[in-house]
């Protein structure tokens, strides 16, 4: 790299101290991290699916706009909803983000685009008239920024180099989520266990009609409208030390705690880590359900591709265990000695409301915006000033020249919104 000091007869220009400090702080994250991943699973019913797209581009042909996407879909009552979501969810999310915006605006727009994409996927699948459903956990990695959207109970955790484990999803199981139980009953659903002859209750809490154990999913046309596809969304920025994501179906999490899953695979490369997590779950509980695990390592570009959490000797112990079926008690990695400031995770956004107008905005567009607007769900262009729901709160997501005041909801999709919120039936009102 050439510098002004290397040119004879020219003095380096003086810069304010604040500018130099700012450059130094930004410089630590200027190089994009390496993303390494692995996946593994065993099938019992064959209803788990996953998605791995490590080389996506926001702007075709522009490598600086690269991002990666990883997802797990745990289907139930058949595979149709899981397959449909795997094939269409990312497309619908990206179509809800306008072209031509910069990276900062894209990251700000992403949480709302994820909501719109999940709902669009649900509406399109319900048009097929099939009764299956699926969980969905979609993870977008852009540099050191991680955005996770989820419905159901396919959990995603973050394990940092300092050994701190963070949960990036919320389980939408009625048995464990009090807020979701209250929402379902307030919307007209009944929450109870299965009743055997004689009135004995068995099994986990379920919502009726339908008997689903989850309060949020994609699909499930045969259950009440209070089962919604609106995801919990969380966005975090990792420190320059990076971290490891573990995304898995409940076949893993019913057997292992978040801590056990993270500790089971520390120090191994992602592909072997995913295999070891699945093996540990099977060792703990047996093959009771489909088990799928995706491990994603976000690694500083100046580090090796293996997370430096364990010494080489302990790595060898883990590898022997994986290959030969035995694991030393000493193979569990010790927490690193990184300082909290070096390994901190900054929370940028978190929202889990099931109310669409809270997630996409509830105001009308300003009259200054005279261009046609596109419904965030059905992706149909609307005439100016047509009945829309939008966020017009100061253009938090803006293109370089004019503010972007979307996403919008057309009147048909607002009917679907009202139905999901328990205000009316939507059997004939899904957007066309």
UniProtKB/Swiss-Prot annotation:
Cofactor or coenzyme needed = Mg(2+); Mn(2+)
Q: Which UniProt keywords apply?
A: Hydrolase, Magnesium, Manganese, Metal-binding, Protein phosphatase
Annotated PPM-type phosphatase domain ranges read 27-298
Entry keyword annotation includes Transit peptide: no
Q: Where, by residue number, does Mn(2+) 2 bind?
A: 74, 250, 289
Residues involved in Mn(2+) 1 binding: 74-75
Query: GO biological process annotations for this chain's record?
Result: regulation of intracellular signal transduction
What catalytic reaction does the record list? O-phospho-L-seryl-[protein] + H2O = L-seryl-[protein] + phosphate; O-phospho-L-threonyl-[protein] + H2O = L-threonyl-[protein] + phosphate
Name assigned to this protein: Probable protein phosphatase 2C 33
Organism encoding this protein = Oryza sativa subsp. japonica (Rice)
Source species taxonomy: Eukaryota, Viridiplantae, Streptophyta, Embryophyta, Tracheophyta
